[in-house]
Regions:
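Soluble or luminal CAZymes and related metallo-dependent hydrolases
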Residues: 45-47, 82-92, 200-205, 237-238, ...
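Metal-dependent phosphoester-hydrolase catalytic domains
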Residues: 34, 39-40, 54, 98-102, ...
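Active-site environment of divalent metal-dependent phosphoester hydrolases
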Residues: 19-23, 74-79, 112-118, 228-229, ...
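Structured beta-strand-rich core segments of catalytic domains in phosphoester-bond hydrolases
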Residues: 1-77, 82, 259-260
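His/acidic metal-ligating clusters that form di-metal
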Residues: 64, 86-111
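Alpha-helical elements of Rossmann-like donor-binding domains used by nucleotide-donor carbohydrate transfer enzymes
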Residues: 3, 88-92, 211
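Active-site neighborhood of phospho(di)ester-bond hydrolases with catalytic His/Asp-centered motifs
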Residues: 13-16, 106-110, 219-222
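Active-site metal-binding loops of divalent metal-dependent hydrolases
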Residues: 72, 110-111, 278
Length: 286
């Protein structure tokens, strides 16, 4: 990451996680002058952290902009408990913002949460997930959960070859979710159908995005594209929009564009293998 920042001429800010169990960090790369930055860790409330900075934009209308970078816990297999975790993380984030100086700001990152009204291509995902299980790429783990095939150092080449034969870049297997074993049994043979997707989507909690909207934040992608799907996850099967850029109310009118790299109008083929999520780009005219 440091090498990438040096090559791009960007400052690199890295946020260590709140919990030692997390191996993932957050990061902000910027060419704008950094006035200050801080990594807020919340042990017991956040899995990762709230990495934020104040940037000098050089604009007369918005001279200083605050950016908050987050990566909320996934835990899709936990259903309501997983969403409750994300609500706790969001609460810690909003408390940080409330304590800080008031200024225009964005909250951006992987929220691992669905927005009210957004579609989820659940049936196509379950069909592919069950194919992974039949191919031995998803196996039964502990506590009745299914998980990606584990690596132990000696089997890396074999696991990589199996993923390649399946048609998925092996570097992306970190994004394969763990789900209760019963999900596989219930969805075996399920047809891919939009009506069934809408039905299944009704049972998914969407509290995190509702809470952000109640706090006055604007979903920049949805503001620019009221009807577009905007799927950001997963690159091996685009099925859901879980990555967002939210703008504070005073900043939202400055948003002029927002889009997913890897789809129109940014059909970059590298985006399909760089991560298990597609990048999201938002432009603001300050």
């Amino acid at each position: 990451l440091r090498q990438l920042g040096e090559a791009l001429g960007m400052a690199v800010l890295v946020g260590e996680p709140s919990e030692p169990e997390s191996i993932m960090r957050t990061a902000i790369l910027t060419r704008l002058p950094v006035r200050s930055w801080r990594n807020e860790r919340h042990r017991g409330r956040m899995l990762r952290s709230n990495l934020h900075c104040e940037l000098e934009t050089g604009s007369s209308t918005v001279p200083v902009l605050s950016v908050h970078c987050v990566h909320f816990a996934a835990r899709f297999g936990e259903r309501a408990n997983g969403e409750a975790r994300r609500i706790r993380e969001l609460g810690a984030l909003l408390e940080d913002i409330e304590r800080g100086p008031a200024m225009p700001h964005v909250i951006a990152g992987d929220f691992n949460a669905l927005s009210p009204g957004d579609n989820l291509e659940a049936t196509a995902f379950f069909r592919l997930y069950n194919r992974m299980r039949r191919a031995g790429l998803v196996v039964e783990g502990q506590n009745g959960y299914l998980m990606r095939r584990p690596r132990n150092g000696s089997n890396d080449a074999e696991v990589d070859a199996a993923w390649l034969e399946f048609g998925i870049d092996p570097r992306l297997d970190m994004g394969i979710p763990s789900l209760p074993k019963v999900v596989s049994r219930l969805t075996r043979g399920m047809p891919a159908h939009t009506t069934l997707d809408r039905f299944l989507g009704r049972f998914l909690e969407r509290w995190t995005m509702e809470r952000l909207a109640q706090a006055g934040y604007i979903d920049v992608f949805r503001r620019i594209h009221p009807r577009a799907r905007g799927y950001t996850c997963a690159t091996w099967l685009p099925a859901a929009r879980v990555d967002y850029v939210f703008a504070s109310p005073e900043l939202a009118p400055h948003a002029v564009d927002c889009g997913v790299v890897g789809s129109r109008p940014w059909p970059d083929p590298d985006a399909w293998n760089a991560s298990d999520h597609f990048p999201l780009v938002a432009d603001f005219a300050l």
